[in-house]
């Protein structure tokens, strides 16, 4: 009985996908981005709101890119905050530094 329910939902999903694909192709051919009367056909279907959400996400991405362009100072500050909050990471970094120093000392002793 569950097989029938799954098959029905798969068929419905397939039909929805084919219909959506057809709409996308038609919109691409008709130039959806250029509404002639000022009201996009999608606005009636509620899809216009989705377009606005994408625009907002793009604006946020642009702001992030601007931060990256300004410099890496922000990234260094973020790392310091993380290390200071946990305390463990800073201790681990100190241990790694000690290992590096010891390795260097051993190399110099062997060279002499």
Swiss-Prot record:
> What's the protein name?
Prothymosin alpha-B
For this record, the Gene Ontology CC terms, alphabetical, are: nucleus
Q: Which UniProt keywords apply?
A: Nucleus
Any one Gene Ontology molecular-function term assigned to this protein's record: histone binding
Q: What is its main location?
A: nucleus
Comp. bias (Acidic residues)? 41-83, 92-101
An example Gene Ontology biological process:
positive regulation of transcription by RNA polymerase II
Q: Please, which domain of life does this record's source organism belong to? A: Eukaryota
Annotated region described as Disordered, given as residue ranges: 1-112
